[in-house]
Amino acid sequence: MIDFHTHSNASDGALSPSELVDLATKKGLKYIALTDHNNVDGLHAAAKAAEQCGINFINGVEVSCERNTHIIGLFLKRFDEINNKAIIRREYIEQSLKNYGYTREKYETLIGARDAFIKMMIDTGKGTDKTFVIEHFLQPPFGYGEAIDMIHRSGGLAILAHPNRTKGIDSNNLQEFIHELKQYGIDGIEVYQSGQTDEYTDFVADLAQRNDLLASGGSDYHSPSKINRELGMYGDIDNRKPIPIDILDKLLQNKDRYL
């Protein structure tokens, strides 16, 4: 079993990086990538735990982009640029929160958990809706080219995550969107994802093949409480299957595409 899209409490996951790796080991995974949102803080601990558990570990990240698009970076080899971007992002959020009367103690636990932060700001009346919170408290998301270039400079492959959850994108215009991303150098697409039908999986697999894109797969695991996202699995909650291990060879063959 494999999983190339997971989260720890270094962003909005519930488990620590080492706990995540331990769970993956117990479930029989052979490869796991940690892809926290916009930061690589948990990679060292996860890699160390993976070495101790005897599981293959892949350095990753999930970059938040415009139009609610997310791009996964896999096989990262350098972390400086992503770290620097994360520091700038945190400083921006910190200053914004100070402007609204929040102390360090209050916002320290929020930075990095983007969705939880947005919900908190709405619930406490500091923001009217998600768009308001993003525009007033958070930096604008990365542009597609900016995110892909950053991943490539970090030595990684750039993979479009869960296209079925990208704002404004559906089966009718996904091909057009892929064409746009290919102009920026996208390397692959997440074919196998949680919460999608077999028909949609087949549709995305066909698009990947026709567009010469690498096929990836990930559960988008966050927490044991999110029962619709199980480590190493994809598909609808009532029709889950292991992420096919046959996608592994091509990904490994291309892991050093950007040295």
Ranges and model annotations:
Residues 229-242:
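Conserved, well-ordered active-site substructure
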Residues 48-182, 239-258:
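Extended substrate/RNA-proximal surfaces in nucleic-acid metabolism proteins
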Residues 1-67, 137, 142-226:
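An N-terminally biased module of ancient metal coordination in phosphate/nucleic-acid-related enzymes
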